Design a protein with these regions (language model features):
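Beta-rich interaction/scaffold domains
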Residues: 1-79
Length: 79
């Protein structure tokens, strides 16, 4: 089943939410009161989501720079 342009845009927006969450956790601006285990789990889940999504074959002109940066930062993160 092919995705519509709207569905692809929604996927890209969701990826942006994961990028923001990963970045904010690493910067200490999100989940500050959570345990290291919870922060690590959240980063790991969001990195996995981004890795799965960036591998999709329906992307065209979307800029994945921030996504790739968040994947790298998340993979290097230890809470």
């Amino acid at each position: 089943m092919d995705k519509t342009t709207e569905e692809i845009a929604q996927d890209f927006t969701a990826m942006g939410h994961s990028v923001t969450l990963i970045t904010d956790i690493i910067a200490g601006n999100a989940m500050a009161d959570d345990t290291a285990e919870d922060k690590q789990g959240c980063v790991d889940r969001n990195v996995e989501h981004l890795e799965l999504m960036v591998a999709k074959d329906y992307w065209t002109t979307e800029d994945m720079t921030d996504v790739e940066s968040a994947i790298t930062a998340g993979n290097n993160y230890t809470a």
